[in-house]
């Protein structure tokens, strides 16, 4: 059981036994952290889960209190809704939002990648030079699908170090994670098929569904505990679902990580209905220190989970190198890649081989995790100071996204448009859903150092939000 889960269960037992009574104030995050030996982010995650389940309530700057009516927290909650969209049409809106972010003077809180200054450009450039000098004549042929054998072996060994058995033969190197995910989707579906996605979901998933002519079954997803398995099963029972596109670690945009127990149950559910799972796992290397996470594939012994990831978030975005551990569909994915992009850049694959064998990657990851944790914590604290109590700031352990929930009558798209006038980019909730359910939400990138420029930008954004709340 994960550390945050142990704390959740411990506090539930204490509440049930009467140690904590309705209305009692729980220990502060810092005090609980010192008492339990857990990090502040782990304690915060546990408290947020208790709040989502109705055990506690929170007030900004006032801490957490035991809920006034505990009985209601033990009653089964209504399962999250499932919505369906027969014609996905979202790409044009997403394109417009992303285009606006390309302005070089823009402060990109809506950016999907980490702060580029965090990338190890010097060492990657050295690896690229070494790769160019030592590239054999046969490089082009050696790097055709499924991709460079050395690189696939390195990736397989990294999984093996976590206890995940993946053969290099089932790994296909792709031009970024999105190609890996889209090829996986093509291997499982035909135009007109139903695909389960989270709601909210990574907008790239919605774009891929639109491009491939697929129908979406959006399963409402809790910001803290993740996808509702009862609702997922209902979707699998009522529709002929051909695939599930899911994120179990540091989900974009919400930031949650499924517990290992829930991951196991999710895989068992997919196996029961014989539905392949396409797992988007691009953020799993960005966990807090000493708090590693496992992909859904870890719990799948039937090869029905297609594990997709990349180096774009953890190393450097511009390389555009990803992969899919495609299980029993590896050959089909290779054929599809051969018909579309033919192959992934051979020089870039060789660059990664040189870099990853130099042992610089682990040192870089350690520093990256530390800086992301520090920057996200500081930005979370500042947002809690700047924003009124009607705005819920959800900041969970790992990766670098913060999710803001505004009152439901607020249109985050209007806030986005006003912020653009101040050269501030944010990601409005509309980008991540095919319904209007998250139109009052905002995703922020917390990977940037909070210097005067970024602090000023957050103050401007907070002023815009307060103005909308006052209307």
Question: How would you label these PLM feature ranges?
Answer:
Residues 61, 168, 395-399:
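Short Gly/Ser/Thr- and Asp/Glu-enriched loop/turn motifs at secondary-structure junctions
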Residues 1-129, 334, 338-344, 378, ...:
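N-terminal basic, amphipathic alpha-helical segments
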Residues 370-380, 392-405:
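Conserved glycine-rich beta-strand-loop-beta hairpin in the small C-terminal domain of fold type I
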Residues 84-176, 183, 357, 425, ...:
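N-terminal small-domain helix-loop-helix segment of the aminotransferase-like
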Residues 301-370:
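Conserved core segment of the aminotransferase class I/II
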Residues 138-273, 278, 285-286, 291-300, ...:
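Conserved core of the PLP fold type I
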